């Protein structure tokens, strides 16, 4: 939020310059995502991989819809499976993938502990809402 404020202040002094937080301002290019890394203490401990998978399964049941405004207004324009974006119509996860809703890093898979990355949020998401969604979906 602070970096957005700083960028807006800098650009406000440049005539004719604007900032777009739209997650897909140009159809022919990759959109702008705000991939969000998530872990708990249990996930980072030895044998934490089972907690990662449990968390992802809970997430798939409770907030699988990437069109949710919590992930950013007009994010559906970015989540079309083209340009390495996850589908907004179906929840998926994988190790080292770039086209899934959730990506588990290769190192996390090898170590059997670590974190996962929610690839659904768009550039204009509210980070507080996204973290609250992850917490509420997986920790309760």
Model-predicted segments: where are they?
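Active-site capping/gating regions of soluble enzymes
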Residues: 1-140
């Amino acid at each position: 939020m602070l970096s957005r404020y700083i960028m807006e202040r800098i650009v406000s002094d440049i005539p004719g310059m604007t900032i777009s937080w739209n997650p897909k301002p140009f159809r022919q290019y990759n959109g702008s995502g705000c991939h969000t890394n998530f872990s708990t203490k249990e996930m980072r401990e030895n044998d934490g991989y089972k907690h990662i998978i449990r968390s992802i399964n809970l997430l798939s049941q409770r907030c699988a819809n990437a069109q949710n405004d919590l992930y950013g207004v007009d994010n559906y324009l970015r989540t079309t499976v083209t340009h390495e974006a996850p589908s907004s119509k179906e929840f998926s996860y994988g190790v080292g993938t770039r086209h899934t809703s959730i990506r588990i890093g290769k190192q996390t898979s090898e170590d059997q502990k670590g974190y996962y990355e929610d690839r659904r949020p768009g550039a204009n998401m509210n980070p507080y809402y996204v973290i609250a969604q992850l917490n509420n979906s997986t920790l309760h």
